A protein has these predicted regions:
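Structured catalytic-domain cores with a bias toward divalent-metal coordination
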Residues: 1-145
Length: 145
């Protein structure tokens, strides 16, 4: 993806920057909720790597792995881009539940639908804004082992 813009959720990520994006998710009743996205873009173009965790709200270990990954000093020399989503299932994390409040498994709801259940709507936003992005050379979602 040389010499091209990197735009996620209408936010342009410039070379050599670290950006936090709060992607708006479907509301739960009248409560606004955001999906935290951390983007670390090196000063030079290179591969794009995507890592996500907590697609199930009871899988907390990946959140800590991503937190530690973000602090690695080697990222100051990054050539390329690292896109991190430490908590995909924000609703499940709030309740320490594998599922969303509609009792659906987010991991089984992709690619989602904007008219569907809460899980389907969350999947649609996440899929359209992040997962369907075609320039990834590597993606990893962290689950319990």
């Amino acid at each position: 993806m040389p010499n091209s813009k990197l735009i996620i959720a209408d936010t342009e990520i410039l070379r050599g920057t670290r950006v936090t994006i709060n992607l708006e998710l479907p509301k739960l009743y009248n409560t606004p909720t955001n999906l935290p996205i951390r983007v670390i873009r090196g000063k030079k173009d290179g591969p794009i790597v995507f890592v996500s965790a907590a697609i199930h709200g009871d899988e907390l270990n990946g959140i800590e792995i991503i937190r530690r990954l973000r602090k690695l000093s080697i990222l100051n020399k990054l050539k390329g881009t690292l896109i991190l989503v430490p908590i995909v299932n924000v609703y499940g994390i709030m309740n320490l539940s594998r599922y969303l409040p509609d009792r659906r498994d987010l991991n089984r709801s992709f690619p989602g639908s904007i008219q569907g259940s809460l899980a389907s709507r969350v999947a649609k936003v996440f899929f359209d804004e992040i997962v369907s992005w075609k320039y990834f050379i590597f993606t990893k979602k962290i689950h319990l082992i």
